[in-house]
Amino acid sequence: MSDTLTADVIGQRVEVNGEHATVRFAGVVPPVAGPWLGVEWDNPERGKHDGSHEGTVYFQCRHPTGGSFIRPNKVNFGTDFLTAIKNRYVLEDGPEEDRKEQIVTIGNKPVETIGFDSIMKQQSQLSKLQEVSLRNCAVSCAGEKGGVAEGCPNIRKVDLSKNLLSSWDEVIHIADQLRHLEVLNVSENKLKFPSGSVLTGTLSALKVLVLNQTGITWAEVLRCAMGCPGLEELYLESNNIFISERPTDVLQTVKLLDLSSNQLIDENQLYLIAHLPRLEQLILSDIGISSLHFPDAGIGCKTSLFPSLKYLVVNDNQISQWSFFNELDKLPSLRALSCLRNPLTKEDKEAETARLLIIASIGQLKTLNKCEILPEERRRAELDYRKAFGNEWKQAGGHKDPDKNRLSEEFLTAHPRYQFLCLKYGAPEEWELKTQQPLMLKNQLLTLKIKYPHQLDQKVLEKQLPGSMTIQKVKGLLSRLLKVPVSDLLLSYESPQKPGVEIELENDLKSLQFYSVENGDCLLVRW
């Protein structure tokens, strides 16, 4: 840039040696002669002061070391969109091809051209582009009016993340020329958003908008969304968003909403987006949430909130109460949940226990933490849940005869699906209530008998094995003990509580506990 400065540089985004900043001041800084730019760095550790020099405040920074004064010729104000595309996507012709002469007719006159093939080839390359990635390419503006529409009219997907765009208006100047644009990513641009209304239909074809780390507020989200009538996916990660109002005439077509890492969001704010009619996926990772309630739905009922929500992500939060998952069972359409790295679920040794409890708590769930819930696993989880809280159920007034059930409100609130599980599998038997609870004592040692139905000469053994031991490890132990290859071993078990019923242990990756093996049961080993 030249040393001639004008006031319109204030607020523009710039790059200096790979670091991004915003211009806050342009002018003279005595006693040193010549023009200076005062910039506020995105990385405050890059700066030296707060915008003042020798007692005079030239501009203000959010951080005491966020500012610097820089000569204009050291600053990169960026490039326009079309130039950035050419720099990245147009293949340069060799010098010999550039010198080729060609006769073309313009009007009635023959005109001799040099490099005409090269120009046509470049235009052809640009017009065919449908997906463009210009991340960190110092794009600052749209460029010449109409140039984008003429040069690359077929673009459908654009990544403009981490560039030098300073305003939403500049984004619109680019996107408005791309009539087929469906996906737009402007993350990591410090954008100034409009304070007035935005004309609807500006980005009529847009389906996916990514605004992560742009500093946008919720009110600005709603204003920008007015220009995206067909929007289906909206990403707003890391913006310090506070949901201040309910979207009424906007976001009605959105199917996916990502609000991750917005620590100001709480449970009450989520009610404001709970009526979006088509919202199917909601990502709430790392927002600090610990509870969620649907007060419009009683025990065993479904809420009217989030009517279409199928997939919920609540990773990296503060969920520490099982009641959280009881509430999720009220969501009528929920089929998939991800809840990794929460206080209730982040202990590796309790991972299987937590998974089973969550499955038992949410009846319609099909996928948990991206792992499919097979019918066998659901049955196992629900039976263990029924058994684990059987004594509590009985003490709270539970009875095998439904007419004699007098369950306390406290128990029904803590275990809203328990009655349903009793209807599904039958009330827990007395012998079940006398055994140790499988979910609560996951790593208990089980005393088991080991028999060999096809080897009558083998002596019956008695072994203590941890309930968490996998079938694969049990086979390994028996292989060493019997001198028989692991691949030849077939395991099953029977319980004295159910004589004559033999259950195969067919999945090597599952634990003894998974198959409800208990103290006193008998392992049957065949080869």
From Swiss-Prot:
It is found in: Cytoplasm; Cytoplasm, Cytoskeleton. The keyword Repeat applies. Residues 342-384 form the LRRCT domain. One of its GO terms (biological process) is microtubule cytoskeleton organization. Coiled coil: none annotated. The modification N6-acetyllysine is found at residue 463. It holds the Pfam family CAP_GLY. Its main location: cytoplasm. InterPro entries: CAP-Gly_dom_sf (IPR036859), CAP-Gly_domain (IPR000938), LRR_dom_sf (IPR032675), Ubiquitin-like_dom (IPR000626), Ubiquitin-like_domsf (IPR029071), Ubl_TBCE (IPR044079). LRR repeats lie at residues 154-175, 180-200, 205-226, 230-252, 253-274, 278-299, 308-329. Keywords: Acetylation, Chaperone, Cytoplasm, Cytoskeleton, Leucine-rich repeat, Phosphoprotein, Repeat. CDD domains: Ubl_TBCE (cd17044). The keyword Repeat applies. Residues 27-71 form the CAP-Gly domain. One of its GO terms (cellular component) is cytoplasm. The modification N-acetylserine is found at residue 2. The modification Phosphoserine is found at residue 495. Tubulin-folding protein; involved in the second step of the tubulin folding pathway and in the regulation of tubulin heterodimer dissociation. Required for correct organization of microtubule cytoskeleton and mitotic splindle, and maintenance of the neuronal microtubule network. Supercomplex made of cofactors A to E. Cofactors A and D function by capturing and stabilizing tubulin in a quasi-native conformation. Cofactor E binds to the cofactor D-tubulin complex; interaction with cofactor C then causes the release of tubulin polypeptides that are committed to the native state. Cofactors B and E can form a heterodimer which binds to alpha-tubulin and enhances their ability to dissociate tubulin heterodimers. Interacts with TBCD. Belongs to the TBCE family. This is Tubulin-specific chaperone E.
